[in-house]
Amino acid sequence: MPKGEGKVVSQNKKANHDYFIEETYETGIVLQGTEIKSIRAGRVNLKDAFAKIERGEVFLHNMHISPYEQGNRYNHDPLRTRKLLMHRKQINKLIGLTKEQGYSLVPLKIYLKNGFAKVLLGLGKGKKKFDKREDLKRKDAKREIERAFRDRQKGLI
């Protein structure tokens, strides 16, 4: 199964707007019982989330998983730091890359694969304001071309 294939629960659309994503990694995530139930219900927000490498392990910060509605007083903390599961070789590679100026680890999406929650982690370099404007211009031009082509096709048929 290719990376990122499975039932997508949540996507971080802002990540592609703010970063040039150069590589992606599929990681497992350590969760508590009520957290996986909330994820399956789609109650996850990746908007402000980021990953950090601490003591040779990868941790995900600021990912909001809403408390499980049918949970009891032992429900989880919505913004707790969660450990990501990766191979040692991948972590060592990321340590070297994130030490370089401007590289960040950003969660792109969270999805369910074979019953397990997975996080697609992207290694990205921050975009400057002019890069974002350039991307918007490129998207608008592409949209205009597609619209003109579609209108032309309708006229010919």
Swiss-Prot record:
One of its GO terms (cellular component) is cytosol. The keyword RNA-binding applies. It is found in: Cytoplasm. SUPFAM superfamilies: Small protein B (SmpB). CDD domains: SmpB (cd09294). Keywords: Cytoplasm, RNA-binding. It comes from the Bacteria. This is SsrA-binding protein. It comes from Bacillus licheniformis (strain ATCC 14580 / DSM 13 / JCM 2505 / CCUG 7422 / NBRC 12200 / NCIMB 9375 / NCTC 10341 / NRRL NRS-1264 / Gibson 46). The gene is smpB.
